[in-house]
């Protein structure tokens, strides 16, 4: 699973989900990519699930780049606990995604297979996504 090795502060404030992505909006490594169309928190389990979906569909011959990392902790108090008495323990690690961000990139010789693999990966993610190609960008 993707989690940070070490953090300065164990518990952070929740990140804002407003605005658009300032960086990471272009396909730079591969030929095809998945671009987020709405804000979301993507957990380390969802990233891993999408990666496995891509790898199972293409088998061998391609390369996949994961452009996001879950570096923000989300805390949650246990069920049935009264208010107060401090912040709860870290429940999961999330990546704060804003619209326009490229989440995954991929290069593969066959275009139809690559687009189908990215479509399957997009179904595992909690936000609306679209598939973009490198040559579509200016």
Swiss-Prot record:
Skewed-composition ranges (Basic residues): 1-16
- Would you say which domain of life the source belongs to? Bacteria
Q: Which UniProt keywords apply?
A: Ribonucleoprotein, Ribosomal protein, RNA-binding, rRNA-binding, tRNA-binding
Q: Name one GO cellular component term.
A: cytosolic large ribosomal subunit
UniProt keyword Hydrolase present: no
Q: What GO biological process term is on the record, naming one?
A: translation
**Listed NCBIfam families:** rplP_bact (TIGR01164)
Name the record gives this protein: Large ribosomal subunit protein uL16
Source organism of the structure? Corynebacterium glutamicum (strain ATCC 13032 / DSM 20300 / JCM 1318 / BCRC 11384 / CCUG 27702 / LMG 3730 / NBRC 12168 / NCIMB 10025 / NRRL B-2784 / 534)
Name of the gene this protein is made from: rplP
């Amino acid at each position: 699973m993707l989690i940070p090795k070490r953090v300065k502060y164990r518990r952070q404030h929740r990140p804002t989900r407003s605005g658009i992505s300032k960086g990471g909006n272009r396909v730079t490594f591969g030929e095809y990519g998945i671009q987020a169309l709405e804000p979301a928190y993507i957990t380390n389990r969802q990233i891993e699930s999408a990666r496995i979906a891509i790898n199972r569909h293409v088998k061998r011959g391609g390369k996949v780049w994961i452009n996001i990392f879950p570096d923000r902790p989300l805390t949650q108090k246990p069920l049935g606990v009264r208010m107060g008495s401090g912040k709860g323990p870290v429940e999961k690690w999330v990546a704060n995604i804003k619209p326009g961000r490229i989440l995954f990139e991929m290069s593969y010789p066959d275009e139809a297979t690559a687009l189908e693999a990215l479509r399957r990966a997009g179904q595992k993610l909690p936000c609306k996504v679209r598939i973009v190609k490198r040559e579509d960008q200016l």
